[in-house]
Amino acid sequence: ICSPPRARFPLFTPPPPPSGRVAFYLFRNGEREQIKWYTQASEVEFELFQDGLYHAAAFIKYKEEQQPIIIHSRPIQVLHPAVPERIRNKTTISIFGSCVSRDLFELKQTDDFEIKCYIARQSIVSAVSSPITEPVRSILGSTAFDRRQVFNDIKKSTFSQLRDKTADYLLIDLVDERFPLVKYEGSLVTMSGGFQNSGLYVPSLPILKKQRLELENGGIEYNVDGKSLRDYVQSFCKEILSIFSQKQIILHRVRFTNYYQNREGQLCEFEPNVKSFNFSINQQLDYLYKCLQEFLPQSHMIDLSAGYYAVENHKWGLAAIHFQKEYYFAVLCALCDIVNLGYKAEH
């Protein structure tokens, strides 16, 4: 049996004076996990029991009556390599989501999966809004994929595509909820980069963001254009359940990370403005996934992103949801486990 790894976190703290004290906290995936109470030591060693992103913080009191000075270490990652299990049978899958789900199937280990339908750059609100019936003039875009996604978002053809291209499973991630919405031709569409470059967008179009409301009972709600976001999610789930059973639905819960690895291999934090956006969008995503689980209680959930970081040399560039390759292997392992579990239940 291997003992857990130990990590020493350099915090660059000068030794406190005789009357001073230092407390050390260990955080895993942003949550406090271990505490070393006030001591005169200037460094600390922790045992790391699980995979994840760790960092330590030192709370330094040079005088007992003073507020502590807080110093954070650089993060380190503990990770065991993931080895996907071969799935028992050829499996078809559709995606309502983003590149963070689609990129799984670029791995060599996914030969037994076939993608039937990929819907991207569409928010839940847009998907269940009224289709634009007027003829759409020529859509501009750098790629055919961009043009197809904008056309789908305008015509609201998501559910008909999913229905026509039958798949064994539907994989859902909500990364594209990061885009605001725009009022266009009497409907709501996703203000993705593709829409902004399509030739359809003009700056005078009203832009809508999800409004966070704190309720008297302490709960949280989001509204879009005066309507509860939860109602949009309920409508979305009703449409999805007319096509897939709950056991065919896999929720790929992704949170935006505050850490990335630069081209020199160093772990860094994103700039404060990026971290502020991450905090806001992660709050929205937590709410949305909670709603999805409310309406799809028997669906599967893959929730692994908290222990991983982004990489600057990602093929799509640096972004808080463009993860290290180990993340995609871990998600693929979880996906294969779900598929194999379903196969065993049927046989």
Ranges and model annotations:
Residues 259-303:
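Substrate-gating cap/lid alpha-helix
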Residues 91-139, 143-147, 170, 175-179:
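Catalytic nucleophile-elbow at a beta strand-turn-alpha helix junction centered on a G-D-S/GDSL motif
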Residues 315-347:
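Histidine-centered active-site loop/cap adjacent to the catalytic His
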Residues 1-8:
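Short, compositionally biased P/S/T/A/G/V-rich stretches that sit at domain boundaries
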Residues 34-40:
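Short beta-strand segments within Ig-like beta-sandwich modules, predominantly Fibronectin type-III
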Residues 46-53:
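Surface-exposed, short loops/turns at beta-strand junctions within beta-sandwich domains
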